[in-house]
A protein has these predicted regions:
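C-terminal helicase lobe
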Residues: 1-25, 29-173
Length: 173
C-alpha cells in the first residue's frame, strides 16, 4: 500500500507523468491535466467507460482516451458474468434479474466497441439524448469520424504492453 500511495502522490503532483494502473486507481483522484487514458481491454459497461475516460481533459485542454479491445474481451466479460457466484442475500429470481441487467450493460459496451458510427452520437443515444441540437456531433473528434474506418487487429501490441506491465511487477507509478 505505501508504494501505491507514493505512486498516487507522485502522479497527482506531476512528479510522475505516467501511471499504469487498474481502474480502481483513478477513483478519487482529482487531477485536471490528465492527457491520456488508455484502456487495455473492454470495460464492463459504457457507464464505467464514460467515468474512466472522463478522467482525461478535465481542464478543457485536448486529451485522448484510447480503447484497445478484441473479441476475446467479450468472451471473457460474458464468462465472468455467467460465473458470478450465488448471492445468499438474493433470491434466484433476483440473481437472474441482476445478471440480465449486467448483460444489458455489457451489450451496450459491445455495441460501442463495434460501431462504425460517430462515437459521440452512440454515447449520447445510449444515455437517452436523441438527436437534440448540439449532442452527438463531434466534427471529427472521435476516431470513427476523424478517419476512414478500417478494422485492425492490435492484439500483438496490446499483449506486448500487457507483458511489459506484468514484467515490471504491476506496481510501479
Amino acid at each position: 500500500a505505501p508504494t501505491r500511495e507514493q505512486a498516487q502522490r507522485d502522479f497527482v503532483t506531476d512528479r510522475t507523468p505516467v501511471v499504469v494502473a487498474t481502474n480502481a486507481f483513478g477513483m478519487g483522484i482529482d487531477k485536471s491535466n490528465v492527457r491520456f487514458v488508455i484502456h487495455h481491454n473492454m470495460p464492463e459497461s459504457i457507464e464505467s467507460y464514460y467515468q474512466e475516460a472522463g478522467r482525461a481533459g478535465r481542464d478543457g485542454e485536448p486529451s485522448r482516451c484510447t480503447l484497445l479491445w478484441n473479441e476475446s474481451d467479450i468472451v471473457t466479460r460474458r464468462r465472468l458474468l455467467d460465473m458470478g457466484g450465488p448471492n445468499e442475500r438474493l433470491t434466484a429470481d433476483e440473481q437472474d434479474l441482476v445478471r440480465r441487467s449486467k448483460r444489458q450493460l455489457l451489450d451496450g459496451m459491445i455495441g460501442y466497441c463495434r460501431t462504425t458510427e460517430c462515437l459521440h452520437r452512440y454515447m449520447t443515444r445510449y444515455f437517452g439524448e436523441h438527436d437534440t441540437p448540439g449532442t452527438g456531433h463531434c466534427a471529427g473528434g472521435c476516431v470513427n469520424c476523424a478517419s476512414t474506418f478500417a478494422t485492425m487487429d492490435v492484439t500483438p501490441v496490446a499483449r506486448a504492453i500487457s507483458m511489459c506491465v506484468h514484467d515490471l511487477g504491476q506496481h510501479f507509478g
